[in-house]
């Protein structure tokens, strides 16, 4: 299966609810590489890459988010592979 890279902006009640840490945990569980960070406008930005099936699984997870989050929308775009190793929470 091919490796792909996706980039997303997640809106709604997604800050102050453990969204970044939960995203990192889910990405690591799926064996993905990338990063997640809060934006000043209240959204969360995520970039991740890996095997297509796992990348799409994280995309579906982002549409729900962790239990305390209320996701209002996810804007996703495909990008070229970034060559990232590991998954981190950016500040």
Swiss-Prot record:
Domain of life: Bacteria
Keyword set, alphabetical order: Hydrolase
Keyword Repeat: no
Top-rank EC class of the record's enzyme: hydrolase
EC number: 3.6.1.7
Active site as annotated: 20, 38
Catalysis performed (reactions): an acyl phosphate + H2O = a carboxylate + phosphate + H(+)
Keyword Hydrolase attached: yes
InterPro entries: Acylphosphatase (IPR020456), Acylphosphatase-like_dom (IPR001792), Acylphosphatase-like_dom_sf (IPR036046), Acylphosphatase_CS (IPR017968)
Gene Ontology molecular functions: acylphosphatase activity
Ranges for domain Acylphosphatase-like: 5-91
Family, as annotated: Belongs to the acylphosphatase family.
Protein name: Acylphosphatase
Organism: Pseudomonas paraeruginosa (strain DSM 24068 / PA7) (Pseudomonas aeruginosa (strain PA7))
């Amino acid at each position: 299966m091919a490796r792909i890279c996706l980039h997303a902006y997640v809106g709604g009640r997604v800050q102050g609810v453990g969204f970044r840490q939960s995203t990192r945990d889910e990405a690591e569980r799926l064996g993905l590489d990338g990063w997640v960070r809060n934006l000043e406008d209240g959204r969360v930005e995520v970039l991740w890459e890996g095997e297509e099936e796992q990348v799409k699984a994280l995309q579906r997870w982002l549409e729900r988010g962790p239990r305390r989050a209320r996701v209002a929308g996810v804007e996703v775009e495909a990008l070229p592979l970034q060559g990232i190793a590991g998954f981190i929470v950016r500040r």
